[in-house]
Amino acid sequence: EMCIRDRCMSRAKSAFGDERVFVEKYIQGAQHVEFQVLGDGKNAIHFGERFCSIQRRHQKLVEEGPWLSDEKRQEIGALVCKGAESVGYKGLATFEFLRDANGDFYFLEVNPRVQVEHTVTELITGYNLVELGIRVAQGEDLPLSQSDITWRGHAIQCRLNAEDPKEFVPSPGRLWDCHFPSGFGIRCDTHAHPGYEMPGCFDSLLAKLLTWGHDREDAVRRMRTALDETQITGVQHLIPLHRRIMDEPDFLNRDITIQYIDNHQDLLG
């Protein structure tokens, strides 16, 4: 252990002229949980949590919510609102945490912006977060109180990246054809269309496919159908991976950590 520390200090000294290093606690069985917050510079409210532990290269692939008990949501929600109010935060923010196997939370960071997965929260609360963020940014006070926020059903989002589903290598090219599902409980946010040139030098996100259900099982069933109905021709994509995840026993049993993809290499095909 001392050897590793000394080596790290040596590298820090040579790279930055400062040998001080931070030692962080290893979180066993870590899960990624984040809270959506809106502040007006004086007060803050939260819109609950999103569960984002299915990741590749520390970037999210599947997000869903809600995930926590009502009691834990109330506890952590009060803390994040207090944090936002203490710095006079104005706008949308995401407070991100790691949760260990014992259920304890460890603060990671605040993302001071709207997140890709804000759509999950919109489906389960019924509020347009982008609109609320704009209204607050232009000087309005919070138009809602915490008691106005309730959660209904369950939502899941799959990121349909233009990537090789085995190695996650970007797959640029022309979309010769594409079709995205619609209907009750389905939302798809995308810029894709037949003839679109998917670039290789920017983020590989092609579409966000979401489903809402009365409970998690209902949302999963609807996501299976939505994935089956989605057609993308011309580039590789992650639909096969997402489809396998929706049937995987650990996923269905909520036995998910940030090592999920690493521990389920068979899902990559």
State what each model feature region is:
Residues 1, 5-269:
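ATP-dependent carboxylate activation and anion-phosphoryl transfer catalytic cores
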